[in-house]
């Protein structure tokens, strides 16, 4: 059911074409709006309707949770006070993520988004990882499962896969289902990492439904309802003060045409507690993960890392910003050493900074090691000064 008009209920198929007639009777089957949840789903892959698609048979012993979540008071949400180790040096060191934080990965196509997600799935120190693959190509879903969610990572993961050829209703339900599964684990006191790839595809599904209902299109063709549903989805993540559990959520956001002002990008940036921007220029220079440090931010980092870590991260950002501002002068040979101490320091530290950001896909760098390596970038000058 997607809406009402002139005393009639408007409905949309969950699957393909069906032999329906006008005024045909409609009978509900099963409990409406509930998701199967719990430990029975660990290691399993389900579709947007909750049906297992991994060939491992039916899921037995699962509990139930409302797809739309349970209403919580804002006072039931805890503050973000502890870091979440994701195993990626640049994120742990410069964009530290907290338990219960909501983070967006903003990226165009082909800049290493899926690879970065795979690194975090394997390395994150979480009790459970819930992954919603929404609106992706079927081939990419299979590839992600076989290469990014394998071995030990698969045993603690639940995957909800709804490819692009499924109905928009199922794509939205897939995101709701993944979030409901994460909420149920949080209610058990678990530390959950929730990954939705991608939030943009969820908005696209909302756009299809909204336009089918006759809603007026606004920016980039999105009707108001498509953007308005994003806060409801994102706000369900966070910490629970009663159980001690948390949902640390990572949402990928596709910057169509590398447009940072896309309505979905703008909306997500205003709601989320931080964003990680992947740069095509960095990817073209073979720097992976291609994180644009100067355009990325974690809004809770200063609350969860010690002061010396904060100072080293701030110094690295300053040197990187100075280098990027004067990059053309340096590359053309127009800058003369000794003209400006800040530029001299930025040039001296730049190779070490780029080496800090680079990381092999199969390498795991714990939070403690990332903090130590960050300070080591500056040698004997932990504040980033260059003598």
Enumerate the predicted regions with their spans.
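Acidic-enriched and Gly/Ser
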Residues: 1-86
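P-loop NTPase catalytic core
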Residues: 93-94, 100-387
